[in-house]
Regions:
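Conserved beta-strand segments of alpha/beta enzyme cores
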Residues: 111, 272-274, 358
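Short glycine-/small-residue-rich Rossmann-like dinucleotide-binding loops
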Residues: 244, 279-280, 304, 311, ...
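Short beta->alpha junction loops/turns
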Residues: 25-26, 94, 255, 312-313, ...
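Inter-motif core of Ras-like GTPase G domains
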Residues: 289-313
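C-terminal-of-GTPase-core extension/linker across diverse P-loop GTPases
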Residues: 2-10, 14, 148-267, 284-286, ...
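Generic enzyme active-site microenvironment
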Residues: 275, 309, 335-338
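Switch I (G2) and immediately adjacent beta-strands of P-loop GTPase domains
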Residues: 54-67, 72-76, 256-284, 302-305
Length: 461
């Protein structure tokens, strides 16, 4: 990536809207926009005060045609999103206007930004670290208020400060040890292996404290996948509609109505839940329905929690017995549906076939048992409602993995000390932990890995 060129991209989602935004960043941002922006003020944008808003029109530099009436927002570096000169052109929303303005900018020598390049520039220019850059994606993807709160705290630098404090303690220890190893003749107080061990113990405790937040953090960030499975006409779609409190899935008496999986998000006591209504599982010669059945089985394998809906008004079918065997000993809820009708299956009959988290009698069509389902899901994932915290929290798999590896390196150094290994070997493990922590914030991460991470971003961000 070249930081000496100027980039542009549409920053708003495609479609019809009140406002469309084209973002421009780089050393020529003010000059390029100035060539196409006409306002009553004769002062060039580059000479105007930063963090100001200006009204005018975008005019094609070759044809003289007015493209749109706009507002231009001027933010000069380093006090901008990218820490470079940034100009945002706010025009009328829609497909045509934003594209035409972007085309004119590109014709003036500006380069089309890559995915995530604005945020990547903010990172490379030192305005944010990698955890904060990733938090921006998490804010965009947040499904609940709690997951948003976790992401905002991370963007504010809560996690970064915690990691940097750990790194500072480790590098101070490394520096002292390496000086005593490299310059034994100097009058520097030598540190014993036992003193190193004593110094590492509180650092390991802090790592354990942070790792203890990982399950809760990941849950708030990613949520849980709940797959609703069962035979056709068991009431899966009725259950989904009752949970969503809307008619999202079509409900009929015809078996095989749901031929593909329907996916929705909802929040249950602060937990983002990815709810998937799958096709009814049965033997069928219908090609489309059989594809839906296969997908249902795939979701069964991937699910964090399986909800098996059984029509309690009919005797247990062979396919249902097979499904019960498949989900036994997994986080699972068995719903004996159609409680408003005469029941042919008792809870005891199901319990005899395996170990399940909960067996509940409901009537999805009548909306009975929905509160109980919410309680069961919540207790399954965390033993109660999950709240965000203002403290540092691990929620990203990459961060969790690197923190575990860093702790493992320090554990190795403790073992090396207890085994009487020389100090220079002990320092190697401590330095490895320091570098792994740097990978979390991006201070020691390879450029290729940085490139890969920013590919997750959209254009214009």
């Amino acid at each position: 990536m070249f930081l000496d060129d100027t980039i542009a991209a549409i920053a708003t989602a495609p479609g019809i809207g009140g406002i469309g935004i084209i973002r421009v960043s780089g050393p020529e941002a003010c000059d390029v926009v100035n060539r196409i922006f006409h306002s009553k003020q004769s002062v060039p944008l580059g000479d105007r005060q930063t963090r100001t808003i200006h009204y005018g029109h975008i005019v094609h530099p070759k044809t003289g045609k007015t493209l749109d009436e706009v507002i231009v927002v001027l933010m000069k570096g380093p006090h901008s999103y990218t820490a470079e000169d940034v100009v945002e052109i706010q025009c009328h929303g829609g497909f045509v206007s934003v594209r035409e303005i972007l085309k004119v900018l590109l014709s003036e020598g500006v380069r089309q930004a890559e995915e995530g390049e604005f945020t990547k520039r903010a990172f490379l220019n030192g305005r944010i670290d990698l955890t904060q850059a990733e938090a921006i994606i998490d804010i965009i993807d947040a499904k609940t208020e709690q997951s948003l709160e976790v992401a905002v705290n991370q963007l504010d630098g809560t996690l970064s400060k915690y990691i940097r404090a750990l790194r500072d303690e480790l590098i101070a220890m490394i520096a002292h040890l390496e000086v005593t190893i490299d310059y034994p003749e100097e009058d520097i107080e030598e540190v014993s292996a036992q003193e190193v061990r004593t110094g590492l113990e509180p650092i390991l405790e802090k790592m354990d404290t942070l790792l203890a937040t990982a399950q809760r953090g990941k849950l708030l960030r990613d949520g849980v996948m709940v797959s609703i499975i069962g035979r056709p006409n068991a009431g899966k779609s009725s259950l989904m509609n009752a949970l969503l409190r809307e008619d999202r899935a079509i409900v009929t008496n015809i078996p095989g109505t749901t031929r593909d999986s329907i996916e929705e998000f909802l929040t249950i006591q602060g937990i983002p839940v990815r709810l998937i209504d799958t096709a009814g599982i049965r033997e069928t010669e219908d090609i489309v329905e059989s594809m839906g059945v296969e997908k249902a089985r795939q979701y069964l394998d991937k699910a964090d929690i399986v909800v098996l809906v059984i029509d309690g008004s009919k005797p247990l079918e062979p396919e249902e017995q097979e499904l019960l065997q498949l989900i036994a000993n997994r986080p699972s809820i068995i719903f004996l549906n159609k409680a408003d009708q005469m029941q042919c299956i008792m809870k005891e009959e199901i319990a005899a076939l395996g170990t399940f988290t909960e067996i509940v009698t409901i009537s999805a069509a009548q909306g009975e048992g929905m509160d109980e389902m919410a309680k069961v899901i919540t207790s399954l994932v965390q033993g109660g409602s999950v709240q965000a915290s203002h403290e540092a929290m691990l929620s990203n798999v990459r961060h969790i993995t690197l923190m575990e590896q860093a702790k493992s390196s320090l554990d190795q150094s403790i073992l090396a000390i207890d085994s009487g290994m020389p100090i220079d070997l002990i320092v190697t493990d401590i330095r490895a932990a320091w570098e792994l922590l740097g990978d979390i914030t991006g201070e020691s991460l390879r450029e290729s890995m940085v490139d890969e991470l920013f590919k997750r971003f959209c254009l214009g961000k």
